[in-house]
UniProtKB/Swiss-Prot annotation:
Domain BMC: 4-91
GO molecular function per UniProt: structural constituent of carboxysome shell
Entry's family note: Belongs to the bacterial microcompartments protein family. CcmK subfamily.
UniProt-annotated location(s): Carboxysome
HAMAP family: CcmK (MF_00854)
Gene name for this UniProt entry: ccmK3
Extent of the signal sequence: none
InterPro entries for the chain: Bact_microcomp_CS, BMC_dom, BMC_shell, CcmK, CcmK-like_sf, CcmK/CsoS1_BMC
Domain of life: Bacteria
PROSITE patterns in alphabetical order: BMC_1, BMC_2
Family annotation (CDD domains): BMC_CcmK
A GO biological process held by the record: carbon fixation
Designated name of the protein: Carboxysome shell protein CcmK3
Record note on quaternary structure: Forms mixed heterohexamers with CcmK4, probably with 1:5 CcmK3:CcmK4 stoichiometry. Only very weak interactions with CcmK1 and CcmK2 were seen. Bulky residues in the pore region probably preclude the formation of homohexamers by this subunit.
Amino acid sequence: MPQAVGVIQTLGFPSVLAAADAMLKGGRVTLVYYDLAERGNFVVAIRGPVSEVNLSMKMGLAAVNESVMGGEIVSHYIVPNPPENVLAVLPVEYTEKVARFRT
C-alpha cells in the first residue's frame, strides 16, 4: 500500500498537541516525528497509507483552526509516496521507538 508523510507546523505547543491528537484519532497513521522548530513553532509528522494521511491531515488542520488556544498553522505539507532519499535524510522513518504504535 502506498505510504505518505504528512507534516504540520504550528505556532505554540497547544496547537501542535491538538493537531497530533486529531491526526492520530482521525486515521490509521503513526506519529513519527515531533520537535520544536524555532521561535515557538512546533512541527509534527505522521506516516501511513496515502488516503489515511490525507484524512488525518484534514483532521489535524481543522483541530488547530477550531481551537480556542490562539495557535495558528504556520505551514503544512503532504508527501505521497516519498522517495527513499527523502526517507533516508529526513527524520520521518519508522523507528524502533514508534514501531509498537505502527498501524
